[in-house]
A protein has these predicted regions:
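Hard-cation-handling environments
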Residues: 72-224
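Conserved anion/nucleotide-ligand pocket segment
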Residues: 42-45, 49-90
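Core alpha/beta catalytic barrel or barrel-like domain that forms the active/cofactor pocket
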Residues: 12, 59-62, 105, 112-113
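Active-site histidine-anchored catalytic micro-motif
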Residues: 1-52, 174-188, 195, 199-210
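Loop-rich catalytic cores of soluble enzymes, especially ATP-dependent carboxylate-amine ligases
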Residues: 33, 50-56, 67, 213-224
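Short hydrophobic/aromatic-rich motifs at helix boundaries and adjacent loops
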Residues: 17-21, 58-60, 132, 164
Length: 224
């Protein structure tokens, strides 16, 4: 019995060769910030129905490029390089009725797994050659624009000093330690500089520290 497998996932997923081999179709969310998980689920369900009822034969190809970068210049809105690539890919999908789905993968860079990378997943109706050609083309475009994804960086000291110089509430985002991107979330670099340069500023700093949690659980309310 041949059972079709259709997968929907985050566009920041680590898509492996095994996942491509063991599924009929992989559809990623199209928006970052993530606004369309339910809509992507609907697209996946429709494709599954078409496979079962309309004899659609999905052929999928993923040309992966070894590009790892933060999400700073990778929103799918505005004029980021990733948004431009995504819009171009979606226009390609609209212009070719034989394309069932296109997805652009930007893998979370801190997952720390073998064979990480991103690129275009193309699914066609029984036309692997076209899927391969388009996937390779867009993955090459992605690689060729890699320098555009480099963000402006600040040291923790620079970020804190710049933040405290502004008379407003400030959000400092340490993207390299983002738990949602696969990092541990235990960096105290920003906290250290806040203590050094703004010890009396009211601040909230998130730090993953199970040992500190254990100590707190064993102390009464009001302890320091």
């Amino acid at each position: 019995l041949q059972i079709p497998i259709v997968v929907t996932l985050d566009l920041h997923a680590h898509v492996t060769e095994k996942m491509i081999k063991n599924s009929n179709a992989i559809l990623a969310w199209e928006q970052y910030p993530h606004l369309d998980p339910y809509e992507t689920g609907q697209r996946g369900a429709k494709l599954m129905r078409d496979i079962l009822e309309k004899n659609i034969k999905p052929k999928m190809f993923f040309s992966k490029t070894p590009l790892l970068h933060s999400a700073i210049n990778a929103s799918t809105f505005g004029n980021t390089p990733f948004a431009e690539l995504m819009r171009s890919l979606k226009q390609e999908e609209k212009s070719n009725p034989n394309i069932l789905s296109t997805s652009f993968i930007h893998v979370d860079p801190y997952i720390d797994q073998p064979d990480m990378g991103g690129g275009a997943i193309i699914i066609t109706n029984d036309d692997l050659k076209t899927a391969e050609k388009i996937s390779i083309d867009y993955s090459k475009q992605y690689w060729d624009r890699r320098i555009e994804f480099e963000p402006v960086l600040f040291s923790p000291k620079e970020a804190v000093l710049k933040g405290i110089s502004i008379d407003k509430n400030i959000l400092l985002v340490e993207t390299a330690d983002a738990c949602g991107g696969g990092a541990v979330g235990d960096s105290i670099q920003s906290l250290r500089e806040l203590i050094n340069f703004a010890p009396n500023k009211k601040s909230l700093v998130h730090v993953v520290d199970p040992f500190a949690v254990e100590i707190c659980l064993n102390k009464p309310l009001g302890s320091k």
